[in-house]
Amino acid sequence: MFVLLSGLLAAAASSLLWGWVLARPSQTRPGDAVKLIPLTPWSGLGSGRRLSRFRLHSADPTLSITGLTAQVEAFGLDALPRPSLQASVRVGFGDDLPRQAVRDVLGSEVLVEVELAGELLDLKGLHAATLELTWQTYGRHGWHPGGTTLVVPLGRAVAPAQPTPLGIASVLPVPTRLVVPGDDLAAIVAGAIAGRMQPGDCLAISESALAISENRLVWPRWTQAPSRAARALSRCFPVASSLATPHGMQAAIDEAGLPRILLALLFGGVTKLVGLRGVFYRVAGWKVALIDDVGGSLPPFDRAIVLAPRSAPAFVAEVSRRCGTEAAVVDANALGVRVLAATPGVDVARLEQALEGNPHGNGIERTPIVRVRWSQPSPDLSEIAKEGAPC
């Protein structure tokens, strides 16, 4: 008995050790310790320039940030690049921001001001710009590169189209400007639907827009190399899957943990032999199922991996409080519709049926909000929340 228990303990310890080794990134970069903290939102909307301030902070005080540079790329309403913007970067220490060039050695914490400038005429046909900030760190580990990608909204929302009747309801996609990390999405929703709501209407908000506003993004260019496990397990998925790339699989491992991913693969492989599909995602969890790999989102976020939103229930409650209407966060695409979170008065099955045509769109529509107006009241629909003024 003692020998058997010892063998089981040894096997468990060995499995944990190998799981830890396999899950470790194969390359660790000291530059990843540097974080960019936004201090002010982008100002200057409606003019030919955008201005914002950030703080570059190194968690390791022995690292010095050097060689800060910026490269900007603008995108038109058709999501194609436009060479119409220039970026300038000014740096300083503490709260002091002199208008000066980048210094050779900046220290472990730096105040950064970024300005995008372009002709006003050029900005009218743009919807976003990406700003790639790159730097190097120098310390006990030598020189190492680092960087991050910022997305700047440029264009304004266009007028919404006419409602589309779908039998049980009419749906109205409501456009907004591009949602970017750090946005108050509930405030954007309230402003976009002002004057367009009636009692009994329901708002369906895209889960991708919520995830982006929460900065649930992984930019493969700036992340550590995927682990050995991610590179190996990604080969188990068809090429069209978001988990078929090492970075996509690494995102799944980071979200659910390697043991759960291995268990999901085991159950998924066995049940597929008897004709059951989708078991992997049921075991791995909904956060893994919602991962969108590079190329799966609206440009310029098509260069990033978009993870599942973190606070969907709290978000729909906030939208309901601000707008006095029912709300839901939904994942809608050509494969189907799934409601992730909804206020108590939402008839989930009915809402999923109304959104089957994917009125949010999967292209460059910039319509993260869909207003659903029922043709007939639902017998299960609870009384609309009375707290907060109607939008």
Predicted features and spans:
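N-terminal and secondary-structure boundary signal
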Residues: 2-391
